[in-house]
């Protein structure tokens, strides 16, 4: 009952959690949480599989076209794939959000047409989501703009804690039958960067960001979602040669 109240309904969600996470979420002791996780992992038979079995699991991977043949080619030929996180970083106006908006439309196509026959969740941290642009993309593709917009679930995240909380909401929506196949976070690091200013808070920021990325990966793995995130850039003054521009977030990103 406590697990259901916390929005946890399946074994995989329990199996990939840490005892402290499960304990905090469900309001149970670490010892009880540890036993629950062990039981879930045993029932799911999580462990090693041979290459043939792993290849069979890979057959369930979904691919969503980006709208650019060249970009699809760079991503392996078929676009953004499920059960993984795809990051796009660049300067303001470089097209990161545009790719995300196009993916939000394309995910609604049938699988055989380069989509995933599902809905998109768009976590907007910087006020970049534009319904008018979605309508333009849909009209160009000869799709019903209003129907396309109804299949995109948008949430404006106002701080990093809100951004983290929204991931739990996504799990609840999927449990309630929403066919979500794409999660977009635009942008990944904006709130973390603003709230943890200065070198003195760098370690705290990196820990929180690292945990958030791990939660994104758990969502992607548990529900066979594709995750697309955009990221800001900064200049590395210590770099003597080449392009000093690098993605915000350091090695954990």
Predicted regions located by residue number:
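Residue-level signature of catalytic and energy-coupling elements of molecular machines
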Residues: 14, 71, 88, 134, ...
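Generic enzyme active-site microenvironment
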Residues: 85, 122, 184, 229-230
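Compact, charge-rich alpha-helical regulatory domains located at protein termini
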Residues: 1-54
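Amphipathic alpha-helical transducer elements in NTP-driven molecular machines
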Residues: 65-68, 72, 82, 97-98, ...
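Conserved, well-folded catalytic cores of nucleic-acid-processing
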Residues: 6, 17, 39-46, 74-78, ...
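Phosphate-binding/switch region of NTP-binding enzymes
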Residues: 206-253
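The Walker A/P-loop phosphate-binding site
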Residues: 2, 39, 43-147
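Conserved inter-motif catalytic segment of the P-loop NTP-binding fold
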Residues: 115-201, 215
């Amino acid at each position: 009952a406590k697990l259901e109240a916390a929005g946890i309904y399946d074994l995989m969600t329990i199996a990939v959690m840490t005892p402290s996470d499960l304990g905090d979420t469900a309001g149970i002791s670490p010892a009880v949480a540890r036993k629950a996780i062990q039981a879930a992992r045993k029932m799911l038979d999580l462990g090693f599989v041979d290459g043939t079995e792993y290849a069979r699991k890979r057959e369930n991977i979904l691919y969503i076209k980006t709208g650019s043949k060249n970009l699809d080619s760079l991503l392996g030929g078929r676009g953004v794939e499920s059960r993984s996180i795809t990051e796009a970083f660049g300067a303001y106006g470089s097209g990161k959000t545009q790719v995300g908006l196009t993916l939000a439309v394309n995910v609604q196509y049938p699988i055989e047409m380069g989509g995933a026959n599902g809905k998109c969740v768009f976590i907007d941290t910087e006020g970049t989501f534009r319904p008018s642009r979605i309508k333009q993309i849909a009209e160009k593709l000869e799709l019903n703009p209003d129907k396309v917009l109804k299949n995109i679930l948008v949430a404006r995240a106002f701080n990093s804690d809100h951004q983290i909380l929204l991931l739990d909401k996504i799990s609840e929506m999927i449990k309630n039958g929403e066919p979500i196949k794409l999660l977009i976070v635009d942008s990944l690091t904006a709130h973390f960067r603003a709230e943890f200013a200065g070198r003195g808070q760098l370690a705290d920021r990196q820990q929180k960001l690292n945990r958030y990325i791990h939660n994104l990966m758990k969502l992607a793995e548990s529900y066979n979602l594709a995750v697309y995130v955009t990221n800001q850039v900064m200049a590395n003054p210590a770099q003597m040669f080449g392009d000093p521009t690098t993605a915000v977030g350091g090695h954990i990103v």
